[in-house]
Amino acid sequence: MLPVIAIVGRPNVGKSTLFNYLTKSRAALVADVPGVTRDRQYGETTIDSQRLLLVDTGGLVDTENKEVAPLAETQVEQAIDESDCILFLVDAKAGLVPADEIIAERLRKKGKKIFLAVNKADRARAAVVQSDFYKLGFGEPYVIAAASGRGVKDLMTQVLENLPEEKEVIEKEVGIKIAMIGRPNVGKSTLINRLLGEERVIVYDQPGTTRDSIYIPFARNDENYTLIDTAGIRRRAKIQDYVEKFSMIKSLQAMHAADVVIFLLDARQGVTEQDLRLLNRIVEAGVSLIIAVNKWDGLNIEERDNVRNAIDRRMPFVDFARRYFISALHGTGVGKLFRAIQESYQSIQQELTTGQLTRALEKAVAEHEPPLVKGRRIRLRYAHLGARHPLTIVVHGKQTKSLPQSYSRYLANYFRKTFNFIGVPVHIKLKTDPNPYEGQEER
């Protein structure tokens, strides 16, 4: 699971500035989807090859006229409780204020590793600033300037060195990892109960994990699977007994740990903004996607047509994902999900050589050439596999920076069709070949 770092502090100390500085490397990887409100409180970063999930707690609540509100709000409490460590941010210019001391006292009770960072500090006053905040009791404060990044590298290096070790390990034998993602009360617990409780399904405890584990290994028809429990669905004494609550952090962690995501929609409620935000996150994660529309049996023909039309209209950015209309309660259509999981997983495991991808690129260009730039055709030379999770195909050529987004989408769809990627978002990464004459003087 991705380690979770919560950024905590009173309003206007620079939490969002630090969050934006740390996550800016992600901004260019995935374009915003038209019509989808981006959820910017959660972001990823990679530091020294370690991926991290960051939570800007200031973005989780309206803090206007609430000096210590961020820590008191339920969402923020949940984010802190689910984090692996905390970046406690204070303001050097304002100095130590009572609100900082109140937050510090509350954080101490959490039993988490806490890093105190003093933001907006001048280099010349670093020693003075540190002494002011020593009394908070979190050891030597880290003096940073979030806007410029000064001191942030040293801070994050210490964070990495103090992350807790992974408590649970998924072994290869547990097979395909499945995450169930969806809003509260769309039927996730019912569907999980159906998946685990059907005939011929063997549920077993994995050695070294507790009954409360977020990993639930099971087998069906001699195939091994592991269900990654996302939204607080915890096993009690019996498999059939569940309690559900929504956690964005656990959902994001599960997306990145899974091989396949089943995204559950409630047919009676249609497509909501929260559905779109979650789907956008899944596309960013690059994981194989299956869409299951639940509670389908309770709709008449007209209502079903309306739901299908709403999905087509509001979810075109996931048109690569297969849809299944099911009833988790009665089991209708649930069996098809296992076949879909197998097909989606197998499609992403296929070998993809540079030769295969380059030949597909050549055919794509022959069928639909890139546009002209200043009278010259953009040339795409070859392609290779950049990453498998998320599936990233790197395309090399000349003037690729001028290639429109629409053509990148065309290439992604062409590769998906050519190699029969089932339910897999394809990311295109463009690289421009170096100009051999650049830097030479004209004669």
Curated annotation (Swiss-Prot):
<feature type="domain" description="KH-like">
    <location>
        <begin position="350"/>
        <end position="434"/>
    </location>
</feature>
<dbReference type="InterPro" id="IPR006073">
    <property type="entry name" value="GTP-bd"/>
</dbReference>
<feature type="binding site">
    <location>
        <begin position="229"/>
        <end position="233"/>
    </location>
    <ligand>
        <name>GTP 2</name>
    </ligand>
</feature>
<dbReference type="GO" id="GO:0042254">
    <property type="term" value="P:ribosome biogenesis"/>
</dbReference>
<comment type="similarity">
    <text>Belongs to the TRAFAC class TrmE-Era-EngA-EngB-Septin-like GTPase superfamily. EngA (Der) GTPase family.</text>
</comment>
<feature type="binding site">
    <location>
        <begin position="119"/>
        <end position="122"/>
    </location>
    <ligand>
        <name>GTP 1</name>
    </ligand>
</feature>
<protein>
    <recommendedName>
        <fullName>GTPase Der</fullName>
    </recommendedName>
</protein>
<dbReference type="InterPro" id="IPR015946">
    <property type="entry name" value="KH_dom-like_a/b"/>
</dbReference>
<keyword id="KW-0677">Repeat</keyword>
<keyword id="KW-0547">Nucleotide-binding</keyword>
<feature type="domain" description="EngA-type G 1">
    <location>
        <begin position="3"/>
        <end position="167"/>
    </location>
</feature>
<keyword id="KW-0690">Ribosome biogenesis</keyword>
<keyword id="KW-0342">GTP-binding</keyword>
<dbReference type="GO" id="GO:0043022">
    <property type="term" value="F:ribosome binding"/>
</dbReference>
<dbReference type="GO" id="GO:0005525">
    <property type="term" value="F:GTP binding"/>
</dbReference>
<feature type="domain" description="EngA-type G 2">
    <location>
        <begin position="176"/>
        <end position="349"/>
    </location>
</feature>
<feature type="binding site">
    <location>
        <begin position="9"/>
        <end position="16"/>
    </location>
    <ligand>
        <name>GTP 1</name>
    </ligand>
</feature>
<dbReference type="Pfam" id="PF01926">
    <property type="entry name" value="MMR_HSR1"/>
</dbReference>
<dbReference type="InterPro" id="IPR032859">
    <property type="entry name" value="KH_dom-like"/>
</dbReference>
<comment type="subunit">
    <text>Associates with the 50S ribosomal subunit.</text>
</comment>
<feature type="binding site">
    <location>
        <begin position="182"/>
        <end position="189"/>
    </location>
    <ligand>
        <name>GTP 2</name>
    </ligand>
</feature>
<comment type="function">
    <text>GTPase that plays an essential role in the late steps of ribosome biogenesis.</text>
</comment>
<dbReference type="InterPro" id="IPR031166">
    <property type="entry name" value="G_ENGA"/>
</dbReference>
<feature type="binding site">
    <location>
        <begin position="294"/>
        <end position="297"/>
    </location>
    <ligand>
        <name>GTP 2</name>
    </ligand>
</feature>
<dbReference type="InterPro" id="IPR016484">
    <property type="entry name" value="GTPase_Der"/>
</dbReference>
<feature type="binding site">
    <location>
        <begin position="56"/>
        <end position="60"/>
    </location>
    <ligand>
        <name>GTP 1</name>
    </ligand>
</feature>
<dbReference type="InterPro" id="IPR027417">
    <property type="entry name" value="P-loop_NTPase"/>
</dbReference>
<dbReference type="Pfam" id="PF14714">
    <property type="entry name" value="KH_dom-like"/>
</dbReference>
<dbReference type="InterPro" id="IPR005225">
    <property type="entry name" value="Small_GTP-bd"/>
</dbReference>
